[in-house]
Design a protein with these regions (language model features):
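Active-site SXXK
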Residues: 44-47, 61, 67, 91-121, ...
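Bacterial Sec-dependent N-terminal signal peptides
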Residues: 1-34
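Short, surface-exposed loop or secondary-structure junction motifs
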Residues: 79, 133-335, 339-340
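Short, glycine/proline-biased beta-turn/loop segments that scaffold the active-site neighborhood
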Residues: 117-133, 222
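Central antiparallel beta-sheet cores of small beta-barrel/beta-sandwich binding domains
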Residues: 408-471
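Short, well-ordered beta-strand elements
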Residues: 340-343, 347-357, 484
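Short, conserved catalytic-motif segment at the N-terminal edge
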Residues: 35-92, 114-116, 130, 167, ...
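Short, gly/Ser/Thr-rich active-site loops of penicillin-recognizing serine hydrolases
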Residues: 355-420, 487-505
């Protein structure tokens, strides 16, 4: 009896072993069928075509899925003059993708209870403060700086790295241009100065330079060994920047006045680690620096950017219907650099694309979409069936109350400037500065605010060149017009303007 029992047990054990082995093999085959090795040949072909036909010096790309790097490759030259090839550790200028890194640093300080996102930015600024001619500056909070609703407006200014006075402190920029133009929390206005101020907040709160804080609290813990703040003439493996002209000429080395907005350099390999953090994967060679709760908060604290399905979180642009998926994007672009980090968190996928020259957004998006299509069959299906529809341009009639003559002052850091604006239904629209010649208004539009351009000169040193286009963005409050005049000269500099309607014709 015992013999038969033992024999039965042996056979039972063998059958179970065979069954488990077969099931394991079937499962493995199933996974291979479901997740074949991605074919990135079309993605690479698109990149090579750009290098060949559009004279792009170099492009580097990385694709991450489920915490693994599926593609990481560089094409072309980091430095044409010295015939230096780009590689996955070459550091590229990130332009406004830097904002995602600055926002991450703010969230780290928030987790350490050194910053309250709902507190005024001025609470944390030591030497200079933002100001306003109309609004309560305490409403310009850290979170509103992060999502571009603080009331600040357009600002951009660089200096040449080899100039003795470069770089300059952001303090002068805040003192001269840190003006709350719009009611905080009520208007999305993309602001480089806002992120420059956040970089200053990080420095003032941590008692470290902004550069040192990023190095010690973000780059080193994440293992981002080829990431740093600001251009360096001594750094060896850095992609030279080339203008987007037909010759792709070498661009000068410049430094931003707002490093928190646009001064980080990084490589595709480093940004792959940064993406893994936000996809909540194990960071290769690094450790987690902010919690998943902070990541969710950054990606879900949304304000509308004015386009369908387009929002802005804290340091990230959000598209809630990107070919059927929610996409989280950090992006920077200038005439001499391009940087993209686009994630689809629900699928645990990210694509990074870097270049050392200006490339159109459509070209970059096509490459990124092809990469997503290689790893996400549903994305590929949605992309192929997508039919672009032209959104009709909505026109707004100018209110009759805007017609007439307006007089007031432009406030600059040097002096106040008299200004008169004349608007008529017949199209005789002019701006007069001081008692100078009338300047013809062009591109007059109305969409909640009044927009138009003139060519002139405010005679302030910061513009450096003249004449230049001045862009007006004005709001009406009863018989008052207020808002921003942006001097688009060598820099983009905003000035406060306030006018009252007169009875004059």
């Amino acid at each position: 009896m015992k013999f038969f029992t033992a024999r039965n047990l042996v056979w039972k054990h063998l059958l179970i072993t065979v069954f488990i082995s077969a099931a394991t093999e079937m499962s493995a085959q199933s996974k291979l069928t479901e997740n074949p090795k991605p074919d990135f040949s079309k993605t690479k072909k698109l990149i090579k075509a750009q290098l060949e036909h559009n004279k792009i010096p170099s492009i580097s790309i990385a694709v991450i899925k489920h915490g693994k790097i599926l593609l990481e490759e560089s094409f072309g030259l980091a430095d044409k003059e010295h015939n230096i090839k780009a590689n996955i550790h070459t550091s590229y200028y990130l332009a406004s993708l830097s904002k995602s890194i600055t926002a991450t640093a703010i969230m780290r300080l928030s987790e350490e209870n050194l910053i309250n996102l709902n507190s005024p930015a001025n609470k944390y600024l030591k030497n200079v403060k933002v100001s306003s001619f109309l609004w309560n500056v305490d409403s310009a909070t850290i979170q509103r700086l992060l999502n571009h609703t603080s009331g600040l407006t357009t600002y951009h200014r660089d200096c040449y790295l080899n100039e003795p006075s470069c770089p300059q402190s952001i303090d002068s920029a805040v003192q001269r241009y840190g003006i709350i133009f719009w009611e905080p929390g009520n208007h999305f206005d993309y602001s480089n100065l806002g992120y420059g101020i956040l970089g200053k907040v990080i420095s003032d709160v941590s008692n470290k330079s902004f550069s040192n804080y990023l190095e010690s609290e973000l780059f080193t813990p994440l293992g981002m060994q080829n990431s740093f703040l600001g251009a360096s003439l001594n750094y060896k493996n850095i992609a030279a920047r080339y203008n987007s002209d037909s010759a792709r000429s070498r661009a000068p080395d410049v430094v931003s006045y707002t490093p928190g907005a646009s001064s980080v350099y990084s490589s595709v390999d480093d940004l792959a680690k940064f993406a893994m953090l936000f996809l909540k994967d194990q960071v290769n060679g690094g450790k987690k620096i902010i919690s998943n709760n902070s990541i969710d908060y950054m990606e879900n604290s949304l304000v509308s950017s004015g386009e369908a399905n387009r929002f802005h979180g804290l340091g990230w642009s959000i598209n809630t219907n990107y070919y059927g998926f929610k996409a989280v994007t950090g992006q920077g672009g200038t005439s001499d650099a391009n940087a993209w980090l686009r994630m689809i968190p629900s699928e645990d996928v990210a694509v990074i694309l870097l270049s050392n020259t200006g490339i159109s957004g459509d070209i970059c998006t096509n490459i990124i979409n092809e990469a997503f299509s290689s790893v996400l069959p549903k994305f590929k299906q949605n992309l192929s069936s997508y039919q672009k529809t032209d959104t009709p341009v909505q026109s707004f009639l100018i209110s009759d109350t805007l017609y007439g003559r307006w007089k007031g002052k432009i406030h600059t850091y040097k002096k106040d400037i008299d200004i008169t604006i004349s608007l008529s239904k017949e199209g005789n629209n002019f701006v007069t500065l001081e008692n100078d010649n009338a300047l013809k208004i062009s591109n007059l539009e109305f969409n909640e605010r009044l927009f138009f351009d003139v060519f002139g000169d405010l005679k302030v040193d910061d513009t450096e060149t003249a004449p230049y286009k001045m862009g007006f963005e004005l709001s009406q409050l009863d018989n008052k017009l207020y808002g921003a005049i942006t001097a688009n000269a060598k820099a983009q500099l905003p000035f406060w303007v306030e006018l009252n309607k007169t009875a004059e014709r």
